[in-house]
Amino acid sequence: MAAYGQISSGMTVDPQVLSSSRNIGVSLSPLRRTLIGAGVRSTSISLRQCSLSVRSIKISEDSRKPKAYAENGAFDVGVLDSSSYRLADSRTSSNDSRRKTKIVCTIGPSSSSREMIWKLAEAGMNVARLNMSHGDHASHQITIDLVKEYNSLFVDKAIAIMLDTKGPEVRSGDVPQPIFLEEGQEFNFTIKRGVSLKDTVSVNYDDFVNDVEVGDILLVDGGMMSLAVKSKTSDLVKCVVIDGGELQSRRHLNVRGKSATLPSITDKDWEDIKFGVDNQVDFYAVSFVKDAKVVHELKNYLKTCSADISVIVKIESADSIKNLPSIISACDGAMVARGDLGAELPIEEVPLLQEEIIRRCRSIHKPVIVATNMLESMINHPTPTRAEVSDIAIAVREGADAIMLSGETAHGKFPLKAVNVMHTVALRTEASLPVRTSASRTTAYKGHMGQMFAFHASIMANTLSSPLIVFTRTGSMAVLLSHYRPSATIFAFTNQRRIMQRLALYQGVMPIYMEFSDDAEDTYARSLKLLQDENMLKEGQHVTLVQSGSQPIWREESTHLIQVRKIKIGG
């Protein structure tokens, strides 16, 4: 195949390629990048200004300046500009009714049966979370085995497994019966083990007395109760109740504005992490990460184990906010754990911090989860509060990859209804979002060929209202496409089961397992047939095919391709 000229507004074209019009393909490189308008016909896309007829334009990274390669097809090229968003258009007009924001469900007594895991998966669960603060390895092993059994039955459905470490939590001890704390009452915490009296309970942290000071505010169970420290001895912290409530066993304790001087990864956490390595979980959610050193320590350990597990940091302490940039850079993704975050910091800061964490993660292509109290009332009630519905919508609008259910599915009375509510609210909110891309030109393509192609593929898919199909061995192009938030689904075909599992967390990505063929056309045809058989594509619909990277499906050298095809049933 010969090169016909550099990509520019004055690109030259071999006249022999003008005769065929089977497929549409274009390399969206520096052609002023203004997408003004498109009139879609069965064999071509009409854009303004200069005309180019090709089946596909492939960019080779072998030379410094991109070269255009053309074969078979028709395409009219106009001025292409990434700033031409259809801001006035909402996604309601799209034929794609699949939810793009992912749902993380915590598995517990209410949801650990085979039947319930199946039902949660069918209702919309994308990630099964194992909370290592509760249960033992035997119970979590059952959950892992059930999720893997479910995954083995499908090539187009993937439930990822997330192991959430307990972390260095300070908790109250066990109490035989709940203790009701009343405002103004004196109440004590002791570092002596096994104490459970009407006015004193033990804590699990020997340095608790040293960490707190007179005047500190203690928050119990994420702020459900609060106490002021009045005095302390060598083994006792004496408090007065400010906000009362029912104190149950093993409630979490925070000191407002302070983090406990505990290691971020405890001995128990290391045991749980090894358990995750043995079971090949997909994600670790690491609790109370204070700095990037913790992330590097865990990643180094995983490297020695040859374990391909992504590290999600939980941002939930005052220290994590101080070190946020370095922590986000070091991790593979983040969770906005609003419960403890709102306990250690003023609650009015939490919405702003949520927005900031989402923005930082999205700017460097890392997934972000919004968690805690999303549908808290549905633990005991069949319908959510209106504020909870708005909370879900805000997380979706801010661009979170996933939203999480904790007690709602772990021990709540209505786990399936909670998932259904989250699914419905997220889907409706997504339909109202403007059709656009969110990146600036400088981040779109400067110095990164893959980002450039993902950026322009998203623009093309938005303009044509077409789904994207990406073929990936590493998941990287699917992640880049997710970053630019195209309005339609990203069907990510991969021949790696681990990559399929990992992509389950990313916004807008539907991972599908499929063996790749040496024949690119065979791989294309099988992918389209699979989607047609599952009624995910319709007759006459256009799809945007994307391939980019060092391991393309049709040849060994690094190649990039964007191609548009029209679906013909049986053709």
Swiss-Prot record:
Residues given in the record as substrate binding sites: 129, 314, 339-340, 372
Positions bearing the site annotation: Transition state stabilizer: 314
pH-dependence annotation: Optimum pH is 7.8-8.0.
Cofactor section: Mg(2+); K(+)
GO BP field: seed maturation
Transit peptide: 1-55
EC top class, as a word: transferase
GO CC list: chloroplast; chloroplast stroma
Residues where K(+) binds: 131, 133, 164-165
EC numbers, comma separated: 2.7.1.40
Pfam families to which the protein is assigned, alphabetical: PK, PK_C
Record field: catalytic activity: pyruvate + ATP = phosphoenolpyruvate + ADP + H(+)
Localization terms from the record: Plastid, Chloroplast stroma
Annotated pathway: Carbohydrate degradation; glycolysis; pyruvate from D-glyceraldehyde 3-phosphate: step 5/5
Keyword RNA-binding: no
InterPro entries: Pyr_Knase, Pyrv/PenolPyrv_kinase-like_dom, Pyrv_kinase-like_dom_sf, Pyrv_Knase-like_insert_dom_sf, Pyrv_Knase_AS, Pyrv_Knase_brl, Pyrv_Knase_C, Pyrv_Knase_C_sf
Amino acids binding Mg(2+): 316, 340
Family according to the record: Belongs to the pyruvate kinase family.
PANTHER family xrefs: PYRUVATE KINASE
Subunit and interaction comment: Oligomer of alpha and beta subunits.
Reported function: Required for plastidial pyruvate kinase activity.
Name the record gives this protein: Plastidial pyruvate kinase 3, chloroplastic
Organism name: Arabidopsis thaliana (Mouse-ear cress)
Lineage start: Eukaryota, Viridiplantae, Streptophyta, Embryophyta, Tracheophyta
